[in-house]
Curated annotation (Swiss-Prot):
Cofactor detail note: Binds 1 zinc ion per subunit.
Subunit structure: Contains catalytic and regulatory chains.
Listed name of the protein: Aspartate carbamoyltransferase regulatory chain
Domain of life: Bacteria
Family annotation (PANTHER family): ASPARTATE CARBAMOYLTRANSFERASE REGULATORY CHAIN (PTHR35805:SF1)
Residues that, per the record, bind Zn(2+): 109, 114, 138, 141
HAMAP family membership: Asp_carb_tr_reg (MF_00002)
Length: 153
C-alpha cells in the first residue's frame, strides 16, 4: 500500500494472492509453477515498495487456489512469501511456505546426462538438508546439488 492507502495492484474478489515475493522472482514463479496456464485473470506487481523487503513482487490469480504442496514448493524461491486465500474481497486464509521433503515437477536437473532430460518423466528432488544451504538430490541420477545450482538452471 502507498502512503495514501491506495492499492497499487487491483483487488480480486476470489482467488490467491502470493505476497512478499523477492523482487525479480515473480516472473520465474509464474513460469516454473505454470501459473499462466489458465484462462483466469492474473495480476502481477513487480518491484513494488515494501517496508520489510525494500522491493517485492506480488501475484494475484483469480478463481484459483494453490494446494498445500504448491505453497510449500514456493519456499525455495520465496521463503518469506505469504499466500492469501481471498473470498468476497476478504482474506479468509493465510499461509507461509515451509520446506517440503520432496519437490516434484517444478525444477530441472542441472546434470545434463540425467535421464530426466531425455525421457518423458517429471522431475523429482529430495530435500536433503534444511540449514541455510539446502541440498536437492535428483531422483533419477541421484546427484546432489546445492539448491542455488538447481535454481539457476
Amino acid at each position: 500500500m502507498t502512503h495514501d492507502n491506495k492499492l497499487q495492484v487491483e483487488a480480486i474478489k476470489r482467488g490467491t494472492v502470493i505476497d512478499h515475493i523477492p523482487a525479480q522472482v515473480g516472473f520465474k514463479l509464474l513460469t516454473l509453477f505454470k501459473l499462466t496456464e489458465t484462462d483466469q485473470r492474473i495480476t502481477i506487481g513487480l518491484n513494488l515498495p515494501s517496508g520489510e523487503m525494500g522491493r517485492k513482487d506480488l501475484i494475484k490469480i483469480e478463481n484459483t487456489f494453490l494446494t498445500d504442496e504448491q505453497v510449500n514448493q514456493l519456499s525455495l524461491y520465496a521463503p518469506q512469501a505469504t499466500v492469501n486465500r481471498i473470498d468476497d474481497y476478504e482474506v479468509v486464509g493465510k499461509s507461509r511456505p515451509s520446506l517440503p521433503d520432496r519437490i516434484d515437477s517444478v525444477l530441472v536437473c542441472p546434470n545434463s546426462n540425467c535421464i530426466s532430460h531425455a525421457e518423458p518423466v517429471s522431475s523429482s528432488f529430495a530435500v536433503k538438508k534444511r540449514a541455510d544451504d539446502i541440498a536437492l538430490k535428483c531422483k533419477y541420477c541421484e546427484k546432489e546439488f546445492s539448491h542455488y545450482v538447481v535454481l539457476a538452471n
